[in-house]
Amino acid sequence: GGAEKAAAMQSIMLTKLGYQVHIVLISNIIVFNYKGIIYNLGELKDKNNTFIGKIKRTFLFRKYLKDNKFDAIIDNRLRSNGLLNEIGICKYVYRNFKVLYVVHSASYKEEILKSTYLKKWLLSKAFKIITVSEGLRVFLKQFYNNNTLVCIENAVEVEAINYVTNQPFEIPYKYILFCGRFDEKCKNIKLLINAYSNSKIYNTGVKLLLLGEGDDREMYEELVANLNIAKYVEFKPFTINPYVYMKHAIATVLTSFYEGFPLVLVESLACGTPVIAINCETGPSEIIVNNVNGLLLETYNEDELSFALQKITNEKDTLNKFKANAVESIQKFNFTSISEKWKNILENH
């Protein structure tokens, strides 16, 4: 997911800045390129995930931190586990360490509103709370000390993306792209499918390509069948290189109910491909300049999204303008700029 990808990118940035990086894996899964020394608690989790197993891993985690005498800990976990687990990590494992907690998702807003005091207490000793968008930072000001909150967006490595997009690619049709998790509660993909059907851009040979995996795929396939657009909608599985799909798309679309920092939009723009997104509370408005590098919609309105799909498909001058502005528009999120933000926080505070 996005948090794992961001953590992997952090490991590469910090290694290039000269820091010795260790990565503690909570789950035994490595998908993205990284730099650093791996300590894999996930292997132990696979062998024994009982209550006793969890207690043992908590003690081992604490011992690993103490043995290595780390100067700083960057916690990229989503922190959606049970209360006992969070108390064990925040109040025991991290005790007397300099900890930077990264808040990746706006879903944290709902969680914190459910248990305001608890969230404040768990992170009360935080050295910094890093938010991946300015909107998230502003929201969290009501719960945490403003001096503790810092916005550091997720980075994108444009040169590396350009390199991998040069791979052979053999999709013979034009398409609108969705790239992400098939999770309706967050991603709101039914709206995109309905708007695509309503737009009738398939009559001009433009398909809808849904790239990803998740529990809701079957529901989307059923919706596509019911709308009689199955021959115009393609489902493709998760790939480590979604960028080649982004490069050849007409546009990448995001209809999420919430995001922290929708990296997929930045990655698409890095590929030179415009974006269409609904302006959920945090994220899209910090990336998209409406009618400059894409279209930023203000409501979850099917007709409005259908019109946006028609506009970007049919108006070649508009599409070419967005393409021309795409890469330049995301320079503030480049590898060097975001690396400097991390260096500043780690060394000057």
Residue ranges and their predicted role:
Residues P274-I278:
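Short hydrophobic beta-strand element within catalytic cores of glycosyltransferases
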Residues F257:
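Aromatic "clamp/platform" in nucleotide-sugar-dependent glycosyltransferases that forms part
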Residues N279, V289-N291, L295-E302, K311-K316, ...:
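Conserved acidic donor-binding segment of nucleotide-sugar-dependent glycosyltransferases
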